[in-house]
Design a protein with these regions (language model features):
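A short acidic (Asp/Glu
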Residues: 71-73, 83, 165-169
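Conserved acetyl-CoA-binding loop-helix of GNAT-fold acetyltransferases
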Residues: 120-147
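Terminal substrate-recognition subdomain of acyl/acetyltransferases
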Residues: 1-23, 37-38, 117-118, 122, ...
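A structural signal for short, well-ordered beta-strand segments and their strand-loop junctions
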Residues: 61-62, 79-85, 153-157
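Short intrinsically disordered coil segments
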Residues: 98-102, 141, 199-202
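Short amphipathic alpha-helix that is part of the acyltransferase structural core
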Residues: 2-79
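Conserved acyl-donor/pantetheine-binding loop and adjacent beta-alpha core of acyl/acetyltransferases
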Residues: 84-125
Length: 203
């Protein structure tokens, strides 16, 4: 989990889960998988590519080999799970809260550079063809939230009923107050811990 910047530490933590940021031909494969699983509209390949170039994150993926702990020296195993991790600037975080963040074509000013500290994380979503991949990616997201960016809220917008059940159930996301487009938020680990301690003390 070593890394010079927060975004590097996120990428290294993901690698410990056999999950990796996608670029090049892997992005083409990933977008095709996502379209098949959740449908359009999705961010374009060009958008996914510049988000990766800017952050070295964006769309993270796990392959069948990675999920099964098998070697894949030629990097040829197909993808079976995707997790979008888009780090937000302060302006981007505020835009999400105001329903002004464009998840399909985000403004560069809303997305961190690799050197910046994220004010929040927008999840492009979770798309999986294997149930085990969903569990792995949720666990990765929770690990990142707790151990690497404990002060940052996470946001997502569910596009399928299954996605809504996962986000509201397992991950316990709730609708951002005042959101008219159903933006969901998972409070930062620090906020969640403070709330737990407060409610336990009041019990």
């Amino acid at each position: 989990m070593q890394g010079r910047t927060t975004l590097e530490r996120i990428a290294r933590a993901a690698a410990d889960f056999d999950v990796h940021a996608l670029s090049g031909s892997r992005l083409i494969e990933a977008r095709s998988l996502a379209v098949g699983l959740v449908g359009e509209p999705l961010a374009s390949l060009e958008t996914m590519a510049w988000v990766y170039d800017r952050t070295k994150l964006g769309l993270l993926g796990v392959t069948y080999a990675g999920l099964n702990g098998e070697p894949d020296p030629k990097d040829s195993s197909p993808l079976c799970g995707l997790l979008g991790v888009v780090p937000l600037t302060i302006a981007g975080n505020q835009a999400v809260l105001e329903d002004a963040f464009n998840a399909i074509s985000p403004a560069p000013a809303h997305i961190c550079t690799s050197e910046e500290e994220p004010a929040g994380i927008f999840g492009w979503g979770i798309a999986v063809s294997r149930h085990e991949a969903a569990r792995l990616l949720v666990n990765l997201g929770m690990f990142i939230s707790e151990h690497i960016i404990p002060t940052a809220d996470w946001y997502m917008r569910a596009v399928t009923d299954d996605g809504a059940r996962l986000l509201k159930g397992r991950m316990k996301l709730t609708v951002v107050e005042g959101s008219k487009i159903g933006t969901l938020r998972m409070p930062s680990h620090q906020k969640a811990e403070a709330f737990f301690l407060q409610t336990r003390g009041a019990a």
